[in-house]
Amino acid sequence: MRKERCRIGVVAPASRMAPEVAERVPAVARSLYPDRTPEIVFHPQCLAAHGHFAGDDETRAQAFLDIANDESYDAVWFARGGYGSCRVVEAVMCKLTEPSRRKAYIGYSDAGVLLAALYRSGFETVAHGPVAQDILRDGGDAAVGRALAWMVDRSPEALEPTVSRLKLTAAFNMTVLSQLLGTPLQPDLDGHVLMLEEVGEAMYRIDRSLFHITSNAEIRRVAGVMLGRCSGIIPNEPDFGMNEEEIARYWCQRSGIPWLGRADIGHDTNNKIVPFGTSHERC
C-alpha cells in the first residue's frame, strides 16, 4: 500500500557529515513535496567525530542498525562517502533484522561496501546514487532531488538512462569494488551490466584497478562494463599515454568482457541512480 509520507533515515558509516546538510536537505524536500514532504531524520551520529570517522566503529555500526532495523523507516540514506564502511560492515550485517529487508538503501563511493554486502545478502532495493552531502556541491539541489525522487516514488526519471532497457545492473566506484573482490563481501554480479566511476586517481591507478577487476573470474561473468565519469584525475608523470576510456576498453578486450560504452554516473551532482539488480517499484 502506498504511504502518504516517506520516512528516511540518514546515517554516516564512514566520514563525518557537515552540519549544514541537516538544514539544507529538508528544505529541498519541502520545496519538492509540499503536500507530502518526506520526513528526513539525521541520526545524531552523522555529526560525531572520532579522528577520520563519524564516531568510532561501534558508534557508526550501531547508528546504521538503529535506522535499518527500525520498521518506521522506509529508506536508509548515506550521509556521505569518505572512508570507513569496511570497518563496520561485518558487525552490521550479522545484526540486521527483518525490517531492514523492507527498506531502500542509497549511496555511492565508500557506501559501496555496505551496498555490496546488502545486495549479496539478498536485499532487493539497493542503489548507487547521490548522498545527502551532495547538497553542498554545485548543482547539489538537483542531486538531492534525484535521490528523493527515487526513495519516495522510484521515479524512472532519476535513473541512469540505460537502466530501463537493461535486465540487471550494478554500479561502483572502481577502487571500492577492486578492494572488495576476493573478500566475503564480493557480490554476485553474474549477468549484470557493471557501471564503474572514479575520482582523484592517476591514470596508472585506474589501469591497476581495472586490471584487478577484470581479472576476477566472477567479474568475467558480467554482461558487460560501462564507464562513468573519472574526475579529478591526478597528473601522471610521465603521461600515461591512454585516457580512462582507452584503459577500460583495453582491459575489457583482454578479459573478454563486453565493452558497452559510457554511463551517466560519477563523483558529481550529475550522478544518476543505478539500482542493483532490477529497478523496483516504489514500496
Please tell me what each predicted stretch does.
Residues 1-72:
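ATP/NTP phosphate-donor binding region
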Residues 25, 56-61, 208-213, 239-247:
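Charged helix-capping and loop-helix junction motifs
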Residues 94-117, 125-131, 254, 258-260:
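Short, acidic/small-residue loops that bind anionic groups at enzyme active sites
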Residues 112-123, 268-275:
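Glycine-rich, charge-decorated loop segments at or immediately adjacent to ligand/cofactor-binding or catalytic sites
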Residues 123-182:
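Conserved anion/nucleotide-ligand pocket segment
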Residues 188-237:
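Internal helical hairpin/lid segments
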Residues 229-283:
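ATP/nucleoside-binding phosphotransfer catalytic cores, i.e., glycine-rich phosphate-binding loops
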